[in-house]
């Protein structure tokens, strides 16, 4: 969901697992 997460591996992994970054 967050564009910043794309730059941050840790946040990306968290969102992908929990929110399902899309």
UniProtKB/Swiss-Prot annotation:
A Pfam family reported for this protein in Swiss-Prot or TrEMBL: Leader_Thr
Similarity comment text for this entry: Belongs to the thr operon leader peptide family.
BP terms from Gene Ontology: threonine biosynthetic process; transcriptional attenuation by ribosome
Name of the molecule in the record: thr operon leader peptide
Keywords of the record: Amino-acid biosynthesis, Leader peptide, Threonine biosynthesis
InterPro entries (alphabetical): Thr_lead_pept
Highest taxon of the lineage: Bacteria
Physiological role: This protein is involved in control of the biosynthesis of threonine.
């Amino acid at each position: 969901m967050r564009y910043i997460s794309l730059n941050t591996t840790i946040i990306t992994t968290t969102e992908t697992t929990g929110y399902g970054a899309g």
